[in-house]
């Protein structure tokens, strides 16, 4: 080897750097030229000479062009674990557990208040017609009519001899009906008639106002889980999770030159005590302390909002009859109801005879008719000759029953009984199943780099040899100076919980807190023990008059009341329908002889007289056969309600109704005695990262960690002076918190010692504070495509697509929901009489349709045969449950782990999706009666009652006044269609959409600039660190392409995105109703590629669906809205 030459000139700029992996540039080789010569042309590269000593540092070359990316270096040593990531999204709820063992029956609850009466049931089926009543007494004679006009004088005849009086002539035809006189004064009310047969079922009335809550029903079976509620507020931080899975390898670090291992340094002197750390995170909960004495009873809290209505309790015992309340004032007069359909003729009534009407105006003179019957007694006419006495007529038929009076107003509600005593404490429920662990959190950000140690003293220059094998550790060096206090270390292991403290003294009662937000509805506790019946309360003061209540059912028939006084004069009634001709009344008593009239002219000889009148009525014949059923008579007055029927059998349990609205919180009760500690709840999801606490005191020394992987060789350290290794002392007890010491100076950085023996796995440490963001790593290779993400939120509205062509006709779909009212059809021909129909079931009440156009008046059909009475329809099932949430993928079941220690109780997670129906548990013993629940909603009207028995014949009614019935009036014209209703208020804001799918990986960034030139190295020995081959990037691109194609054809193939699609079929077409109640009707077309274009701006993403007329026992309804893209 020659002697070192003088420093040569600065070399040309070095070749491009190795993409940041190797920061080294090659130095210029020492030139033998002692003087600075001119820069020559760059010669061909000679064979490498033996390595000379390093030349002096050349000037830094200009940065080269960005080089090609270097080969991947070996994997760097594993970095310190990052801070814990943010809590992941809550995992899907596990499947519902098996039903728990049945709890012991709870004690009997206190008796509830009686509920308000339900609405009157539907009208019962018509009963059989009762027997005819006995014939009534003859009515009183009517007032005398005015004299008729004089007829024209006949031609004078010869005076004949007076003949014998002829026999009475036959009755002439009835004259025209006179105008109806004003109504007479109201007669005394007759006794109530027997209950008439129920009328036919009336039209469906308008929906009544929401009734008061009914009494608490019996406890229902547990309903299925409800739909997933909105995400609740973040729970309290849960316990530390298990250690996460091993993180992915970091980006490859720069390969350092292998250094010689220095001797192991001895332990330095102990540094000054560091400043007190920030307050650490909360430790694990300690063991449960001894139960303290009960505190004094707190003051009652502020009244909370009313809670949601509890589940329906069992029916309570019937309470004792309350004292009669004071009569309430009469309600306001109701609006005039719609005319009911014409009812069947009622049995004959017993109305009182009305007063005689006033005299009508005189009629026009008619042509002479046949001899009429004897008239009622008239005013004195012009003198005529006295007629012969007439014979007695037969008695007239009995008049119809008068209508019953309306029911009296409902009396006020009686005073409430005292509330029952609170029940005993219920038994503790079973422990819930442990929830599935949440998903792993994201990786935390890289921690900040620690400060570098101060430079050591410069060592002597050694000759650079080839890297040898790693030598044994040298002797320990002397102790270095005390270093500055390092950064805050990771939290130490959690100390053992201290013993429970002594029982504290009883504290003063705190002030009543404000009402907290209403918590979620807890599970229903077991029923409390029955309270003793309270004493009868004093009657309360009469309340203010309530609004008019719903008409209650008729009461039991009362005793016959005394006759009322005459009513005031009523308004003039409309002309009634013309009644059938009555039988002739009795002849009036013989009138006084009138004064003699002037002698008339002699008449001509009369014709032969008509045959005489009929003889007296014969005896009553035998009762004839029943006549055919007449037309439906006018609706009879409501009869008195019959006695309540026997309790029916319990109906089948209906499906669970939709969840009720959230009630207001009830007032907070006084604090109850402390309950027994409940079983530990399942671990809650990890809470959000808490604020940074104060530094905790230094933790105890932990056990040695497991052996780490062999890292890449570090750079050669400086040789330290050998020191003597001291023996390791035992861990002392945990000291008290010291005062913060001053910062010590920074010590030299010692060498990495050999790996210690593998220690036992320590408990999970508490999360450290997040470090600052580390430097940006190198660009990694494109990763493989990730798993398919959750469904994204809908995109913005897209451009209108072209209309697709109509596909083939599909098979006939199931029967659709009833359509809207169509246009009126043409008048059909008169149909034939239908045969007797079977009884139909009661249909569910329909919702009012849009008003139809006025139809033409149809021809009258022939009357059909009377149908049999229909059986009461079954109770309709409850409405469908709310939409089920998206069903999560069920993970494979893991093996059952050992039971862990009870964690602190986490906050309740959000409700899971509706689970599958659990196995029915065994039938338990009947529980005691539960506490009284809130009054339930008013029930639907009950089914029609059975037909009543035939009533007995009524007593004779007095004869009604005889009046001719007018003809039927023509039907009135249909009313005009009503206007559109007002706009509804906007609905509540929907829940937030699901998290969108993860986006595709970004394109690789530009290569970074070359690093600065470093010291030169001999790289001849580094071939072993090269990567075996380049990664296959093409495979990644291909998988990305497949992933994009899958995004374009969701849930299907390229040619058909819907299963069983039938383009052009409107069997299941949707009619969308806008917020302004306008129905948007379109003819839908589905193209084969799943795209639909439209230029109608109203075809926008749906915000809400409200299906109607669903829930029948034979109906199924499903809805699936697939992914929609609006371009």
UniProtKB/Swiss-Prot annotation:
SMART domains tied to this protein: COLFI
Domain of life from the UniProt record: Eukaryota
Compositionally skewed regions (Pro residues) per UniProt: 1-16, 260-270, 998-1010
Chain intervals with Low complexity compositional bias: 171-191, 221-230, 237-258, 272-282, 326-345, 355-398, 436-449, 461-473, 508-518, 611-625, 634-647, 667-692, 703-730, 758-778, 802-824, 860-872, 898-913, 937-956, 986-997
Comp. bias intervals (Basic and acidic residues): 569-580, 914-928
A GO molecular-function annotation: extracellular matrix structural constituent
Disulfide cysteine pairs (residue numbers): none
Assigned keywords, A-Z: Collagen, Extracellular matrix, Secreted
InterPro entries from the UniProt entry: Collagen, Collagen_superfamily, Fib_collagen_C
Protein's cellular compartments: Secreted, Extracellular space, Extracellular matrix
PANTHER family tied to this protein: COLLAGEN ALPHA (PTHR24023), COLLAGEN TRIPLE HELIX REPEAT (PTHR24023:SF1082)
Family affiliation: Belongs to the fibrillar collagen family.
Protein name, as recorded: Collagen alpha-2(I) chain
Source lineage: Eukaryota, Metazoa, Chordata, Craniata, Vertebrata
């Amino acid at each position: 080897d020659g002697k070192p030459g003088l420093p040569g000139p600065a070399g040309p700029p070095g070749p491009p750097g190795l993409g940041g992996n190797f920061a080294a540039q090659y130095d210029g080789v020492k030139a033998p030229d002692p003087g600075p010569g001119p820069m020559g042309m760059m010669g061909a590269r000679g064979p490498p000479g033996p390595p000379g000593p390093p030349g002096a540092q050349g000037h830094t070359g200009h940065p080269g062009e960005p080089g090609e990316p270097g080969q991947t270096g070996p994997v760097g040593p594993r970095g310190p674990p990052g801070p814990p990531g943010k809590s992941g999204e809550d995992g899907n709820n596990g499947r519902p557990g098996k039903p728990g063992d049945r709890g012991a029956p709870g004690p009997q609850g206190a008796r509830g208040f009686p509920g308000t009466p339900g609405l009157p049931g539907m009208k019962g089926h018509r009963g059989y017609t009762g027997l005819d009543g006995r014939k009534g007494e003859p009515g009183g004679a009517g007032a005398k009519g005015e004299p008729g006009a004089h007829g024209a004088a006949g031609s004078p005849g010869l005076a004949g001899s007076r003949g014998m009086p002829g026999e009475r002539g036959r009755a002439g035809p009835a004259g025209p009906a006179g105008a109806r006189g004003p109504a007479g004064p109201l007669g005394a009310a007759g006794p109530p008639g027997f209950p008439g047969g129920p009328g036919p079922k009336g039209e469906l009335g308008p929906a009544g106002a929401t009734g008061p809550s009914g009494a608490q029903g019996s406890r229902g079976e547990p309903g299925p889980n409800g739909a997933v509620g909105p995400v609740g507020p973040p729970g309290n931080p849960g316990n530390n999770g298990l250690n996460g899975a091993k993180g992915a390898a970091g980006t490859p670090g720069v390969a350092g030159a292998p250094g010689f291992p220095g001797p192991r340094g001895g332990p330095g002197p102990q540094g000054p005590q560091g400043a007190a750390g920030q307050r650490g995170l909360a430790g694990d909960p300690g063991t449960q302390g001894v139960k303290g004495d009960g505190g004094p009873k707190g003051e009652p809290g502020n009244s909370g909002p009313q809670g949601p209505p509890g589940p329906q309790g069992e029916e309570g015992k019937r309470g004792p009859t309350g004292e009669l309340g004071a009569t309430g004032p009469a309600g306001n007069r109701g609006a005039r109801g719609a005319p009911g359909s014409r009812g069947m003729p009622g049995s004959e009534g017993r109305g009182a005879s009305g007063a005689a009407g006033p005299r009508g105006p005189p009629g026009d003179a008619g042509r002479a008719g046949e001899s009429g019957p004897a008239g009622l007694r008239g005013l004195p006419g012009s003198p005529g000759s006295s007629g012969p006495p007439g014979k007695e007529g037969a008695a007239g038929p009995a008049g119809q029953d008068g209508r019953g009076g309306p029911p009296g107003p409902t009396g006020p509600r009686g005073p409430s009984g005292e509330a029952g005593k609170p029940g005993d404490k219920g038994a503790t429920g079973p422990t819930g199943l442990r929830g599935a662990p949440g998903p792993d959190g994201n990786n935390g950000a890289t921690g900040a780099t620690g400060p570098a140690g101060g430079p050591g003293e410069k060592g002597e220059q050694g000759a650079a040899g080839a890297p040898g094998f790693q030598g044994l550790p040298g002797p320990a060096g002397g102790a270095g100076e005390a270093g500055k206090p390092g950064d805050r270390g990771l939290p130490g292991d959690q100390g053992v919980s201290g013993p429970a403290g002594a029982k504290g003294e009883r504290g003063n009662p705190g002030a009543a807190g404000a009402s907290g937000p209403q918590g979620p509805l807890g599970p229903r506790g077991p029923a409390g023990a029955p309270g003793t019946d309270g004493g009868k309360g004093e009657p309360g003061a009469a309340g203010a008059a309530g609004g008019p209540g719903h008409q209650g059912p008729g009461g039991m028939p009362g005793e016959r009341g005394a006759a009322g006084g005459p009513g005031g004069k009523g308004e003039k009634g409309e002309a009634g329908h013309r009644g059938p001709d009555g039988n002739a009344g009795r002849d009036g008593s013989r009138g006084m002889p009138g004064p003699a009239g002037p002698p008339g002219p002699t008449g001509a000889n009369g014709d032969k007289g008509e045959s005489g009148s009929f003889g007296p009525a014969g005896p009553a014949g035998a009762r004839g056969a029943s006549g055919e059923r007449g037309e439906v008579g006018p609706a009879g007055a409501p009869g008195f309600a019959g006695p309540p029927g026997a309790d029916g059998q319990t109906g089948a349990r209906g499906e669970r109704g939709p969840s009720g609205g959230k009630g207001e919180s009830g007032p907070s009760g006084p604090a109850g005695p402390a309950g027994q500690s409940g079983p530990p709840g399942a671990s809650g999801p990890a809470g959000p990262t808490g604020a940074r606490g104060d530094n905790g005191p230094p933790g105890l020394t932990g056990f040695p960690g497991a052996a780490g992987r062999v890292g890449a060789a570090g750079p050669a350290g400086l040789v330290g002076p050998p020191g003597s290794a001291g023996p390791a002392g035992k861990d002392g007890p945990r000291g008290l918190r010291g005062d913060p010491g001053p910062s010590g100076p920074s010590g030299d950085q010692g060498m990495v010692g050999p790996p210690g023996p593998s220690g036992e796995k320590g408990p999970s440490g508490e999360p450290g504070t997040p470090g600052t963001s580390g430097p940006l790593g190198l660009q990694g290779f494109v990763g493989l495509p990730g798993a398919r993400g959750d469904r994204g939120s809908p995109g913005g509205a897209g451009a209108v697509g072209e209309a697709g062509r109509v596909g083939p006709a599909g098979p006939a779909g199931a029967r659709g929901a009833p359509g809207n009212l169509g246009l009126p059809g043409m008048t059909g021909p008169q149909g034939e009489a239908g045969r007797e129909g079977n009884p139909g079931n009661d249909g569910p009440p329909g919702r009012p349709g849009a008003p139809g156009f006025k139809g033409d008046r149809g021809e009258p059909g022939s009357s059909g045969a009377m149908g049999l009475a229909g059986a009461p329809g079954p109770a309709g099932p409850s409405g469908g449950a709310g939409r089920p949430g998206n069903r999560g993928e069920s993970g494979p079941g893991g093996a059952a782990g050992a039971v862990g220690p009870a964690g602190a109780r986490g906050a309740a997670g959000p409700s899971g999706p509706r689970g599958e129906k659990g196995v029915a548990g065994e039938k338990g013993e009947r529980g005691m009666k539960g506490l009284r629940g809130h009054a339930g909603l008013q029930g639907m009207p009950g089914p029609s009652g059975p037909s009543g028995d035939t009533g007995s014949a009524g007593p004779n009614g007095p004869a009604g006044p005889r009046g001719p019935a007018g003809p039927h009036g023509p039907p009135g014209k249909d009313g005009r269609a009503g206007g559109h209703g007002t706009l509804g208020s906007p609905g509540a804001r929907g829940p937030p959409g699901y998290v969108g799918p993860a986006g595709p990986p970004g394109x690789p960034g530009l290569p970074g600039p070359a690093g600065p030139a470093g010291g030169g190295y001999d790289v001849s020995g580094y071939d072993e660190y090269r990567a075996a081959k380049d990664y296959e990037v093409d495979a990644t691109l291909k998988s990305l392409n497949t992933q994009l194609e899958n995004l374009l054809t969701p849930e299907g193939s390229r040619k058909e995105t819907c299963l069983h699609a039938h383009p052009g079929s409107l069997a299941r077409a949707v009619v969308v109703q806008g917020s302004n109640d306008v129905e948007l009707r379109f003819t839908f077309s589905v193209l084969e590629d799943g795209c639909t274009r439209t230029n109608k701006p109203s075809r926008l993403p749906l915000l809400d669906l409200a299906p109607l007329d669903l829930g029948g026992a034979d109906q199924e309804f499903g809805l699936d809205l697939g992914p929609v893209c609006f371009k």
